[in-house]
Amino acid sequence: MSESLAEVVLSLDEVHALALRVLTHNGMSAAHAQAIANVITQGQRDECHSHGVYRLLVCVRSLKKGKVDPQAVPTLRRLSSSIVAVDAHRGFSLLSFETGLPVLVEMAKQHGIAAMAINHCYHFSALWPEVEAIAAEGLVGIAMNPSHSWVAPEGGREPVFGTNPIAFAWPRPDGVPFVFDFATSAIARGDIELHAKQGKAIPPHWAIDADGQPTTDPKAALQGAMRTFGGHKGSALAAMVELLGGALIGDMTSRESMAFDEGVGATPCHGELVIAFDPKVFLGDELDAGLARGERMFASITGQGARLPSQRRFDARARSIAHGVRIPKALYDEILTLLD
């Protein structure tokens, strides 16, 4: 570790160790702490600051609110030959994902397509680590979930939707997968929280205030409603996530999750839907040809100077592996108070 007046530089091992210390010190089981520390380290490594070590503050706050069970043991049920459900029992979601992933992969490789529902989980993390884990098995992955009702539908002013992210990963023959992970809101909730914490203005298309007017004040945005991206198109996708990641799998919508919170301010509790496809089953002897089609499309994008989604993350990943990560000292000091 090195330190300046403004920043602290940590290796990835030091980030992981810090996360483990904070989580176990605050009552998290070793299994949950390991699963969460892995993903927080990945977020910080890829310079996804709203999903890196900042999330330790969110995790501990939720634990202290008494909603999350830090010792919950996920249970798994096979609903059919290609559908698995994992009950998180009001624990954080990441251990449930790790519990169900091997079964999801097995089912997808047997049938060509499989789905996993994660129920009754508290969820704070990005989805790209999950779909990247699916792509690492040679599979195509999709994941989505509702959250708390922070987002107004296009043309409305009252929150109905969550930030409702959708993530997708496509395995590539060489190198990193093609990945995207984006909220159907104009921006992730955590980014507005970070702007408020740092006293920075936000773009007016991110949110509206309590009177329904566009705002550049992040604190007013947090008291008002976030906006969807892409107008009515973003609203439609957000509704789809509510249906697939909530109603379809027997779990709460974002409005129900907000009501369940009872004003405590914990991490959202809801469900998550994960789908995996096996290109080998779909394509058979044409597998290489199918993947080659994808590669030609990617080349047609990058060949004209455009970037593929997540390229910034992958560039950051290489930097962090080589040089460590930089964390604002004020944030680092705040995280250390969680060890008091």
From Swiss-Prot:
Catalyzes the reduction of Delta(1)-pyrroline-2-carboxylate (Pyr2C) to L-proline, using NADPH as the electron donor. May be involved in a degradation pathway that converts trans-3-hydroxy-L-proline (t3LHyp) to L-proline. It is an enzyme of class 1 (oxidoreductase). Keywords: NADP, Oxidoreductase. Signal peptide: none annotated. PANTHER family: MALATE DEHYDROGENASE, OXIDOREDUCTASE-RELATED. One of its GO terms (molecular function) is oxidoreductase activity. The active site is at S50, H51, D191. Pfam families: Ldh_2. This is Delta(1)-pyrroline-2-carboxylate reductase 1.
